[in-house]
Amino acid sequence: MRQHVNPLSKNFFEIDPIPPLNEVFENPQLPLHLDIGCASGDFLMELSLKNKNWNYIGIEIREKLVLNANLKIKNREYKNVYFSFGNAINILNNTNNKTLIDAITSISFYFPDPWFKKKHHKRRVIQPEFINLLSNAMRTRSLIFIKTDVQELFEYMELTILESLKFKKLAYEDFRVNESFNPIKTQTKREKYVLLSQFEIYESIYIRI
C-alpha cells in the first residue's frame, strides 16, 4: 500500500543540507547514483553490495523510513550509502548541495507515488523544472532510470523527460554498464510485490545528450 505524503507541504521547505561527500563516504570520488523515493533503502543497500565502486544516496520524503535506513547502514558499517529526508526538488535546489549535484552519474525513480487525481499531478516527483535542474547538472551520458506499475504515470514521466530535449531514450541492448552495477536487475520491495501480483511493470532508461 502506498503511503501518501504531500511533497508540497511547508514542512519540506526548510531542509538540512546533505553533509559534504567526504564526510559521508569513505571514497567521495566514486561515481554517484541517486535514488529518488528510496523508501526503506533496501534497494540501495543491495545495489551497493553488488558494486562497491559506486556511492549511493537515497532521498525519501517519509522521515521514519530515512531514520531506520541510516540506522541500518550504521549498524552494518556501509561505507558507500547515505539516506536523506525531504523533498528531492528542495534538497537538490539547495545551493549547499551543489557538490552533490555535480557528482551525480545516474538517477533512479522507481515506483514513485502516482498521485492519480489530475489536480494532484503537480505533486508528482518528476516535473519539468526538476528535470531541467537535473539536466543542467548531469554530465553527458549520465543516466535516468524509471520504473512504475502505472502506465499513465510512465507515459507522463517519459514525456516530461523527453520534452526537456536534454535526454534520449536508450534501448536496453545499448545499455552498456558493468553488470555489477545495473539498477535494472536489482528489485525494490514494490517491484517484488508487483511481480508477485503478476501486474505489468513499465520501465525505461534515458541518457543525457
UniProtKB/Swiss-Prot annotation:
Annotated binding of S-adenosyl-L-methionine, by residue:
D35, E60, N87, D113
| Cross-referenced SUPFAM superfamilies | S-adenosyl-L-methionine-dependent methyltransferases
Q: In terms of domain of life, where is this protein from?
A: Bacteria
Q: What class of enzyme is it?
A: transferase
* Molecular-function GO terms, alphabetical: tRNA (guanine(46)-N7)-methyltransferase activity
What is this enzyme's catalytic activity, as reactions? guanosine(46) in tRNA + S-adenosyl-L-methionine = N(7)-methylguanosine(46) in tRNA + S-adenosyl-L-homocysteine
Keywords per UniProt: Methyltransferase, S-adenosyl-L-methionine, Transferase, tRNA processing
- The record lists substrate as bound by K117, D149
User: What Enzyme Commission number(s) does the record list for this chain?
Assistant: 2.1.1.33
A GO CC term assigned to this protein in UniProt: tRNA methyltransferase complex
- Give the protein's function: Catalyzes the formation of N(7)-methylguanine at position 46 (m7G46) in tRNA.
Q: What is this protein called?
A: tRNA (guanine-N(7)-)-methyltransferase
Which species expresses this protein natively? Answer: Prochlorococcus marinus (strain MIT 9515)
Its taxonomic path starts at:
Bacteria, Bacillati, Cyanobacteriota, Cyanophyceae, Synechococcales
- Gene behind this chain? trmB
